[in-house]
Swiss-Prot record:
Membrane topology: Single-pass membrane protein
Residues where heme binds: 439
Source taxonomy: Eukaryota, Fungi, Dikarya, Ascomycota, Pezizomycotina
UniProt-annotated location(s): Membrane
Positions of glycan attachment: 132
Name this polypeptide is given: Cytochrome P450 monooxygenase janQ
Originating gene: janQ
Keywords: Glycoprotein, Heme, Iron, Membrane, Metal-binding, Monooxygenase, Oxidoreductase, Transmembrane, Transmembrane helix
Assigned GO CC terms: membrane
Major location category of this protein: membrane
């Protein structure tokens, strides 16, 4: 009780201090000091509607909203967004926002602010190396990836009967994504280790819950609170397992890089020897687990919910998947890339259920002045609107109507299908960010989601539970979550044409 009182007093003091960081843009919510308090208290439940209101009123410029911890500034003007999104961390830091939101100093030290760590561009280089392997003749990586998915499906679903099977989308989806993430990051034998899968699946959910709790307390109490949270314990355990595996691999002379962890070790030894330690590498891998699993699973769950409640898409998408598999002799990378309608359906599911109402989150690490004269003080949190843009009639006709072929048609009409793929970003589609900090793992996420949806479409009929509609989304601050206990019903199809399972 004493700790709670101290935390409350500290939060109120921190809130008052943070509101002193003033930016001269219109405010959304109630006026005056009391009004700011009321708006801040509404943030947890009404953040998305407040951001929508700001966008509708000031979508040509910018606005600010009082939250329990600070003013949050939303930049709507495209020219201003371009000004800040590509700036280096000495002016606007993306990592500082993540570090504060999830308290990564304790929950994910490999992503903490102000520590020596593997830089994101190097991790992106590793992911690019892995992605390129899929198109190299004779490279077995993608076949191994498919094999790992089929193994994960069998282990995690255990569907043996022909009758209806209730499939818990979030729980089972998280664990299957954990298998594939482990395959990518640390490879065999760890990706088949039950403890690793448990840790990967649990860590993806523990980071935000632990981070939100730790953030409620003043700095002097954070280390104590962290000792009672799950994420720091899981992070430490993963670090120790990865470090042991890395040391064992170093004893095996002549082994080539086969996963992200081993690639980082080889690359740093060859190009920057002595700059990064083994601990730096394993901590970067552990930190990557959260980002790789958390958002991928949420998009996957939305896709499953939408597919189960929109039966008109099932047969056309099934035919496209079947044709691609037959044309390429099984699950091949080229075949998955040819599934343009399925890719469009996934992107529309993501557009229709946007994870975050804001994007391009940055913290000003120094005072900054935009070219139009707007001054932003050091410590200011800046965002670009995301959800409001995705439902803006100017960019997406009939935005409140789900259209699974929306992006497929746009690709055909413009003659530029690549610009409308699930992984594509632009100023009106910021789900993966844009600029310097565009999500480097989005290609792997696309493969995971397409594999799982394609497998389900080929092998199962998919519906909702009887007399139940789509499991409802829920909201916390700016974030939209799918129903984590929601289920769909799968039933094995009577006739399934041959495919490598």
């Amino acid at each position: 009780m004493v700790l709670g009182l101290l935390a409350f007093i500290w939060l109120m003091r921190a809130w008052r201090q943070s509101l002193k960081i003033w930016v001269d843009v219109p405010s959304i919510g109630k006026d005056g000091i009391l009004g700011q308090w009321i708006t801040a208290l509404q943030w947890q439940q009404k953040a998305r509607s407040l951001i929508q209101e700001g966008y509708e009123k000031h979508g040509h410029y910018a606005f600010k909203i009082a939250t329990p911890s600070r003013w949050e500034i939303f930049i709507c003007n495209e020219k201003m967004i371009k000004e800040y999104k590509n700036l280096m961390d000495d002016k606007f830091s993306a990592n500082a926002v993540t570090a504060d939101m999830f308290q990564t100093k304790w929950t994910a030290p490999g992503a903490a602010e102000g520590v020596h760590k593997i830089p994101i561009p190097l991790l992106a280089k590793a992911l690019t190396w892995q992605r390129n392997r899929s198109s190299v003749t004779g490279d077995t990586y993608f076949k191994e990836f498919v094999t790992e998915f089929l193994h994960a499906w069998e282990v995690e679903t255990k569907i043996t009967s022909e009758g209806p099977y209730e499939f818990c989308c979030f729980e089972t989806g998280t664990r299957i994504v954990a298998h594939l993430t482990a395959k990518s990051l640390v490879g065999h034998p760890l990706c088949r280790d039950p403890e690793i899968i448990d840790l990967f699946a649990g860590y993806g959910n523990a980071v935000p819950s632990s981070g939100f709790l730790i953030a409620m307390f003043p700095g002097i109490l954070k280390p104590l609170v962290a000792k009672f949270c799950e994420a720091p314990k899981m992070s430490d355990r993963l670090d120790r397992i990865f470090l042991s595996e890395m040391k064992e691999r170093q004893l095996q002379t002549g082994s080539d890089a086969s996963d992200i962890m081993s690639w980082l070790w080889h690359w740093t030894q060859e190009n920057e020897p002595g700059k990064y330690s083994e601990v730096d590498i394993v901590r970067s891998i552990t930190s990557a687990v959260f980002g790789a699993i958390h958002t991928t699973t949420q998009v996957l769950v939305h896709c499953l919910f939408e597919l189960a409640t929109r039966p008109e898409y099932v047969e056309p998408l099934r035919q496209e998947v079947q044709q691609a598999v037959e044309n390429h002799g099984g699950w091949e990378k080229e075949g998955i890339e040819s599934m343009l309608k399925l890719d469009s359906f996934i992107k529309e599911c993501q557009r229709f259920n946007p994870l975050d109402s804001g994007s391009l989150a940055r913290c000003a690490t120094n005072d900054f002045t935009f070219s139009n004269g707007l001054k932003v003080a050091k410590g200011t949190y800046v965002f670009a609107p995301n959800a409001p843009v995705l439902f803006d009639e100017r960019f997406y006709p009939n935005p409140h109507q789900f259209d699974g072929y929306r992006f497929y048609r746009l690709g055909q009409q413009t003659g530029k299908p690549q610009g409308f793929r699930f992984v594509a970003t632009n100023s009106n589609y910021l789900q993966f960010g844009d600029g310097r900090h565009t999500c480097p793992g989005r290609y792997m996420a696309a493969d995971e989601i397409r594999l799982m949806l394609g497998h389900i479409l080929l092998h199962y009929d998919i519906t909702t539970k009887e007399n139940e509609g789509r499991p409802k989304n829920w909201f916390f601050k700016k974030i939209l979550f799918p129903d984590m206990k929601g289920v769909i019903v799968l039933k094995k199809r009577a006739e399934v044409r041959a495919v490598n399972k």
